[in-house]
Amino acid sequence: MGTSCERCRRRDEQDYRNLDDSQKHFLLTMMGDFQHEMIIPKEFVQRLKGDIPGEIQLETRNRNSHTVRVDKTQEKVIFTEGWAQFVKTFDLQMGDSMMFRFNGNSQFDVIIVDQIGREKACSAVVDDSQNPNVQERRVDATETLNSSRAHSQPMPMQSTTETVNHSHARPCPMHTAVDCMPLSHAHPQPMPMQFPTETVNHCHAPTGPMEMPLENVALSHAHARPLQMQSQPTDRLTQVQRGNSSKGNMTTMSSSSMSSGYNSIIICIS
């Protein structure tokens, strides 16, 4: 059974070597004096189909790339010049690890994790201050925003009542007499009949107290004047008779005067 497992292991190892280099990964842990140079074990190099060039690019997930010189021996591959700057940029500490993947273009894509296996944010988050293209895009966006604010016009504010009235207002369609005639002929309505007496009373019924016209007042004054003119001779005659006649004559004249007064009153009333 042990022989069978050994055969399987060798077969899997051979199949892995036949994979494309872009599908292969290896992990290095920062140990010893790694700040100035980094040694890559030969077992890692032997798994690659191609040779590692004398100068490579180490690129993190935030597209931050560093050029590193590679020295080769029979036993190992050493990252030398440029490596110290890479360590400083990403603050590599003892116990940190790096996952390498060779993409075949003299470039290794790397993922950096700390001592407890967490990916370092500085190797994944894009730093816009070091990317001129991102800075230009930010400046353009700021200028566009300021320009839009400068040209924007304030909208007039309306009161709540005006807004409600405006939103609920509906134009009323105008109908001509011709448009209304078919409707009236289609739905004739019976007109209520009124008696002549009710119509006359309704039309001529006074709405306030009756007042005598000025013409009637003037006419009544005109008719009353003859009554005064007739009574004046009678009064004068009565005074003369009272002075010259006896008591019986005065009675007779008084009766005559009264009868004349009654006649005048009757004429005025009629």
Swiss-Prot record:
Residue range(s) of DNA binding per entry: 23-116
Cellular component terms per the entry's GO annotation: nucleus
Residue ranges, compositional bias (Polar residues): 143-159, 228-243
Ranges annotated as biased composition (Low complexity): 244-259
CDD domains: B3_DNA
Source species, domain of life: Eukaryota
Stretches that traverse the bilayer: none
Broad class of the protein's primary localization: nucleus
Name this protein carries in UniProt: B3 domain-containing protein Os08g0324300
